[in-house]
Amino acid sequence: YSSLETKKLHAAAQIAQEGANKEIDNYLSGFSFPTEESRKLTKIALLNYCAAAILMPYELFHAECKKLKYDLELLQNTFATSFEQVAHRVTCLQDPKLPGIPFHFLRVDMAGNISKRFSLSGIDIPRYGGACPRWNVYSAFTRPGVIQAAVSKMNNGEKYVCIARTVEKGIGRFGQAKSVLSIGLGCEAKYAKDFIYTENINVNDKSSEIPIGVSCRTCDRLDCSQRAFPPLHKKFDVDLNSRGVSVYVSDNNSK
């Protein structure tokens, strides 16, 4: 069964289809799609965008975001929508005349599959999965329903404020397993003062930074305790006489 918030979004999407179907089809006619299914999926995405705009009108939502400093749970309550819907909507506030913070967004399951991704912040997000295990979008599964905030530093020195929280999808009967996903949202550290989740974090404190990468295969951090695979672009020293937390992590590779 779908949640009330999902039903509301679906109803709004049906309204959008009735009111803007011709305009959307005209827009899609300007693109070439490999299959009819891919065209329909794109249309669903556009209808969902319209639905979110109906439930969370741009100017009103933008004003509330600024007032509440992008407090997602308060925004969720204000607009009677879901946590994921609000997190997705804040990534859409990019009208040049009234822009919001450029966020990145991703949704993952417990197997690490990335089922939704946007990167307006500039951070690199793997397309299919296997992202860095140090991202808090994964550690959020250890504390279900609790928002985690962290300052993450990429290999190139760029810093991002990242938050994550788990959500449950659907309403199941007693005893039925629920689908649990993790929602990640973040922005460049320069927007920290406008993002409520940095109020208890000193973004300039280097000791609070969490070194992250894109994925193990492309990461330079040879001393990472969570490395699962060797890097593709660097020579890796396998030491038969030492043992670290992983066969890919040794004292020789930490230097």
Predicted regions and their residues:
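Conserved binding/catalytic microenvironments
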Residues: 1-222, 226-254
